Design a protein with these regions (language model features):
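Alpha-helical DNA-contacting segments of helix-turn-helix folds
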Residues: 62-69, 112
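Short hydrophobic/aromatic patch on the recognition helix
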Residues: 45-55
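Hydrophobic alpha-helical connector segments
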Residues: 64, 78-108, 130, 163-170
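Hydrophobic/aromatic-rich alpha-helical bundle segments in the mid-to-C-terminal region
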Residues: 109-110, 129, 151-202, 213-214
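Short secondary-structure transition hinges
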Residues: 103-145, 164-165, 192
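Basic, helix-initiating cap at the start of DNA-binding domains
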Residues: 1-30, 34-43, 60-63
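Short hydrophobic clusters on alpha-helical segments that form packing/core surfaces
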Residues: 19-27, 69, 98, 102
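Helix-turn-helix/winged-helix DNA-binding modules
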Residues: 29-32, 53, 82
């Protein structure tokens, strides 16, 4: 009996992964905004009814993609932090890792933007939304640890603020700049600025705002 239950669970997880793969492929083709559940069902070669067994609506599906994105981003942050000794350098490395992640995985970056657009009142503690909250906490924990380390080693100002607050502020700042770089490239170019210049300036200002020396 346990064997059958295990097999069913494995099959359920395999199907869920296939649906997320199909959603990711569809989003690359048409964009997350234009993506529909019908398109994902066709890409996954499933009926709409079966798709809704796994994901209750498009938002739920996006949260599934967001959870994938955060798992990857957490690993990128861990790798980035591991290459530096000083806390402030770890913070900057996380910023660069976030930018590289957004450029390498635009669908995941878009799913994170959709997640950030949901208000706190809409966030649950279970299902795909809850998984995203937990995964997001893990990502922030890496950045918080880097900020805390910087305060201990003297590279981050002790009066910069509580590390969790600093982490959320830096995240919000860079997330907003990334949205500008993604959606307003033509306007930036009109003003004589490239997206890369904007991103480098954001990293410079973000780290300088909390560094003891730069």
């Amino acid at each position: 009996m346990n064997y059958l239950i295990e097999r069913r669970q494995e099959e359920k997880e395999r199907r869920r992964v296939e649906i997320l793969d199909a959603a990711e492929a569809t989003a690359r083709e048409v964009g997350i905004g234009a993506m529909t559940m019908d398109q994902v069902a066709r890409k996954a070669r499933l009926s709409r009814a079966l798709l809704y067994v796994y994901f209750q609506d498009k938002d739920d599906l996006l949260f599934g993609l967001c959870n994938r994105a955060l798992d990857i981003l957490e690993q990128r942050f861990i790798e980035a932090v591991g290459r530096h000794k000083l806390g402030i350098d770890q913070v900057e490395a996380c910023g660069r890792a976030y930018i590289a992640f957004a450029q390498e995985f635009p669908v995941y970056a878009e799913s994170l933007a959709a997640f950030e657009a949901h208000s706190v009142e809409q966030l649950a503690t279970e299902g795909n939304v809850g998984a995203c909250v937990i995964a997001g906490d893990r990502v922030h924990a890496v950045l918080i640890a880097a900020i805390t380390r910087g305060m201990a080693d003297g590279s981050v100002r002790p009066d910069a603020g509580p590390p969790p607050l600093v982490s959320f502020t830096l995240w919000g700042f860079l997330h907003g700049v990334l949205q500008l770089a993604t959606n307003k490239a033509a306007i930036l170019a009109h003003g004589g600025t490239t997206t890369q210049q904007l991103l480098e300036q954001a990293l410079l200002q973000g780290t300088r705002s909390i560094a003891t020396r730069r």
